[in-house]
């Protein structure tokens, strides 16, 4: 019987999509366990990145000896805050492991196959035709130590971004797409000028995604952010960072009392300064940034 490996890998990717942008610096991975042509278990990388998907898929199965594991990314081989995923794969006596991408993390890169070979487990890298760019953000994270950055820009037909006669230059469909987009990023980068003007919550207001509130970074070098804003209601449950000049250090106490976290920078004049800011955001624990301003 011919096995459609891409079918099961695509199932794994559909699982991984669910937590995209919700796993901090770890990639969102999906795993599917197949035995005798039947999916007997599945797993996704947990929120905030741990446990990993392979562990979630295999931990509670009593009898998966001889089964095949399909996972979107090469199983990790190193000890970190959790044991390597190859351990539980070996322990559960998985027969075959198929994965769509090699992990660019130097601690794991191309090492899983060597371990599986030693244990008599067949493993194979199978590229997915439908998800060939899925880990683009993760590869950028690992290569440059910066977050993956996407800019959302709303522009009218006459190439304007503001309409003084209407609050919106977009329609309901495009606004819903923005809410979906926000759900796939762990933080949003905006400016005090934009937030003061719109008083936007910058959250996900769409059925099924209401609980997803990406953390927020606000560039405000001159500390012009208004003290009374709608987003202030969520400062206790949503991390909000105020990025300002070191020269304004002594003027941040009121914002701290409200619940803002302060990030001090020297300047923000060119792309080099912006890249330094991105590195700072990445070190804070964010891998995917959506710019809205």
At which residue positions do the language-model features occur?
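Zn2+-dependent cytidine deaminase-like catalytic core
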Residues: 33-130, 246
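Short, basic/aromatic recognition patches
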Residues: 2-24
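Short beta-strand scaffold segments in enzyme catalytic cores
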Residues: 28-37, 153-154
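Short, small/polar residue-rich loop motifs at catalytic or cofactor-binding pockets
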Residues: 25-28, 148-149
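Residue-level signal for inorganic ion chemistry
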Residues: 12, 30, 76, 116, ...
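Active-site ligand-binding patch in enzyme domains
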Residues: 140, 144-146, 150-286
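Short helix-loop-beta connector
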Residues: 63-67, 184, 287
């Amino acid at each position: 019987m011919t096995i459609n490996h891409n079918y099961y890998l695509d199932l794994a990717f559909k699982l991984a999509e669910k937590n995209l942008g919700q796993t901090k610096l770890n990639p969102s991975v999906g795993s599917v366990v197949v035995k005798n042509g039947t999916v007997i278990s599945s797993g996704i990388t947990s929120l905030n990145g741990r446990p990993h998907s392979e562990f979630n898929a295999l931990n509670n199965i009593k009898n998966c000896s001889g089964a095949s594991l399909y996972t979107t990314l090469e199983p990790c081989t190193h000890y970190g805050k959790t044991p390597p995923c190859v351990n539980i794969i070996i322990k559960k006596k998985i027969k075959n492991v198929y994965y769509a991408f090699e992990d660019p993390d130097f601690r794991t890169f191309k090492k899983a196959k060597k371990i599986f070979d030693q244990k008599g487990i067949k493993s194979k890298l199978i590229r997915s035709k439908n998800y060939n760019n899925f880990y683009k953000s993760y590869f950028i994270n690992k290569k440059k130590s910066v977050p993956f950055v996407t800019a959302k820009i709303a522009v009218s037909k006459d190439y304007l971004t503001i309409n003084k006669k209407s609050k919106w230059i977009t329609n309901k469909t495009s606004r819903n797409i923005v809410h979906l987009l926000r759900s796939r990023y762990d933080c949003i980068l905006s400016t005090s000028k934009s937030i003061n003007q719109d008083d936007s919550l910058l959250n996900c207001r769409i059925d099924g995604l209401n609980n997803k509130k990406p953390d927020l970074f606000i560039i405000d070098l001159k500390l012009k952010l208004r003290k009374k804003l709608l987003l202030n209601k969520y400062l206790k449950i949503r991390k909000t960072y105020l990025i300002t000049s070191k020269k304004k250090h002594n003027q941040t106490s009121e914002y701290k009392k409200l619940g803002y976290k302060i990030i001090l920078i020297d300047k923000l004049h060119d792309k080099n300064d912006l890249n330094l800011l991105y590195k700072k955001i990445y070190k804070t624990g964010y891998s995917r940034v959506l710019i809205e301003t």
